[in-house]
A protein has these predicted regions:
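Hydrophobic alpha-helical transmembrane segments
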Residues: 25-30, 73-78, 100-104, 144-149, ...
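Short loop segments and helix-boundary regions at transmembrane helix junctions
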Residues: 40-123, 220-234, 247-256, 294-301
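Hydrophobic alpha-helical segments embedded in the membrane of multi-pass proteins
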Residues: 33, 55-59, 81, 107-108, ...
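Mid-bilayer segments of alpha-helical transmembrane spans in multi-pass integral membrane proteins
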Residues: 85, 89, 104-123, 135-147, ...
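Loop-to-transmembrane alpha-helix initiation sites
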Residues: 72-78, 99-103, 148, 208-209, ...
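Peri-membrane helix termini and adjoining interfacial loops of integral membrane proteins
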Residues: 1-9, 120-132, 211, 260-267
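Helix-loop-helix "hairpin" substructures at the membrane interface of multi-pass membrane proteins
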Residues: 25-27, 31, 143-216
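Membrane-interfacial amphipathic/re-entrant helices at transmembrane-helix boundaries
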Residues: 1-31
Length: 304
């Protein structure tokens, strides 16, 4: 019960004295910022499967970057852009239903990832864990700068296409009558999702970025109606999830200093505690969605 008997030490002190945890939280908050904006459109447009596909579709680019000795973020960006263009092309030309076509492309990208990983001696267990689960507790100042730059570009694109996305999402016929270009807006939306995934994967990994892209916006969509309010509410929920998730992982699983400096943690090895921190953040976000669903269901039952 230390969180009640000594609230300062439990709730605040972990964030004041450990630069590793501070950078981890900043990376998490940058992830929340971009996924709250982009994820709102993902939820409103009913394209959550697309977000999942793009989240996993970056893996071949990351694997290729490790294989060639390049920058994983650059590899992820190239793969995400290729995946976005590929999804758009398949949606336009394939006779298959939209989700089936996206699933086919996703399977191909995952298979390519397996081939690259199997063929590359340069990719070890540590690299594979970082690809899947991120490296939140190993975030460096340079990582934060790269992430902030990608987040800034994504937010700028979202601002430029905000009106077009708003009209196209709720009334495609009206968008055409207004002289808008739905194809260009659709491509911009795909690239926007690709940018948000690329900006977030280094922190939370390709498997968990989907949770941040969907969970806070989904909870916000059940609480408010207007798009800007949804984005703001999603950001608040995501921020709370990052902070509470970091605290839970810190108190229950160990401190970042122990993780990085302890004798049991060798170079190139990702400890379970490191993997667990972004997962704990995502788990809190999903828990918020479930709580909102239950509360809303109870309220609707009482009013009916």
């Amino acid at each position: 019960m230390e969180f009640l008997t000594d609230p300062w030490q439990w709730w605040v002190e972990p964030f004041t004295g450990d630069p590793l945890l501070q950078r981890a939280v900043l990376a998490g908050l940058l992830t929340v910022l971009v996924t709250s904006v982009v994820g709102t459109w993902v939820v409103l447009r009913g394209t959550t499967y697309l977000g999942e596909a793009l989240g996993h579709g970056i893996l071949p680019g990351v694997a290729a970057a490790y294989l060639l000795g390049g920058n994983p973020t650059a590899g992820a960006l190239v793969a995400a852009a290729a995946m976005a263009v590929g999804v758009r092309g398949i949606q336009r030309r394939s006779p298959l239903p939209g989700e089936s076509a996206i699933g086919l492309l996703l399977v191909g990208m995952l298979a390519l990832t397996v081939v690259l990983v199997a063929a590359a001696d340069e990719i070890d267990e540590h690299d594979l864990q970082e690809m899947l689960f991120g490296s939140l507790l190993r975030t460096s100042p340079a990582d934060l700068l790269r992430q902030a730059a990608l987040v800034g570009v994504a937010i700028l694109v979202a601002l430029v296409f905000h009106h077009a996305l708003l009209v196209l999402t709720f009334d495609e016929v009206q968008a055409r009558l207004m002289g808008m270009r739905p194809r260009l807006t659709e491509l911009a939306f795909l690239l926007l999702v690709a940018l948000s995934v690329t900006a977030s994967f280094n922190a939370v990994g390709s498997l968990l970025v989907f949770a941040f892209l969907v969970a806070p916006p989904a909870a916000a969509a059940m609480l408010v109606r207007r798009v800007p309010a949804m984005m703001a509410t999603s950001a608040l929920i995501g921020t709370g999830s990052v902070l509470l998730g970091a605290l839970l992982a810190h108190h229950l699983l160990g401190t970042p200093g122990h993780i990085h400096g302890g004798p049991s943690t060798g170079a190139g090895h990702t400890s379970p505690e490191e993997v667990a921190m972004p997962a704990t953040m995502a788990l809190v976000a999903v828990a918020v969605v479930l709580v909102v669903m239950v509360v809303r269901g109870v309220r609707n039952d009482s009013e009916s």
